[in-house]
Amino acid sequence: MSTDGKWLSRRFEFPGFGRTMAFVNAVAWIAESEGHHPDLDVGYGRCVVQWSTHAVDGLTENDFICAAKVDCLVE
């Protein structure tokens, strides 16, 4: 995971579009459950997930909680 102080970002790679979209849908479910939504950059076999809290223009505990939940999807 990388952070620049304003964003928590991780790139995930998958062996095809279907697996990528299954991951994206799981991320969406987590985001809706938490009421906290990441920026997603999706392409064939990859997805970059970026968390930030716009209200504080930076990171909060919720960003780290959501990122950890998404990490559990692939570990």
Task: List the predicted regions and their residue ranges.
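Long, contiguous binding/interaction regions
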Residues: 1-75
